[in-house]
A protein has these predicted regions:
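N-terminal secretory signal sequences
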Residues: 4-7, 22-23, 49, 91, ...
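Non-transmembrane, amphipathic alpha-helical segments
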Residues: 16-23, 50-57, 85
Length: 105
């Protein structure tokens, strides 16, 4: 009984469209697999230290993901994402934090 209540509670809290979530998952894997291109961008930017290069590279990846999230919300849902959907986007980034941060470590 408690599992059923918790399962339904978690299901009712998820607002992000499944299509958008799937696109974002694919974009995360695409971004981390194209690390050579992003590294070239980072290197050409002339950052002063490895820490700055790391932060800049992660910023590029997060920017790509945010752009996809916003664009897909507009394309699929025909509207801007809600605050709840944005919170779920942040949660998705947190779930993939190790994968995203290890790209530039």
């Amino acid at each position: 009984m408690i599992f059923h209540i918790l399962f339904n509670y978690n299901q009712s809290r998820q607002v992000m469209d499944e299509k958008i979530q799937k696109v974002l998952e694919e974009k995360i894997h695409e971004s981390t697999s194209r690390i050579n291109e992003i590294s070239t961008l980072v290197t050409s930017s002339g950052q002063d230290s490895p820490e700055e290069e790391n932060a800049f590279g992660q910023g590029i990846i997060i920017g790509r993901l945010y752009n996809s999230f916003y664009y897909q919300s507009r394309r699929i849902l025909k509207r801007n994402p809600t605050e709840q959907e944005f919170s779920e986007f942040i949660q998705l980034l947190k779930e993939h934090e190790n994968e995203l941060s290890s790209s530039f470590s």
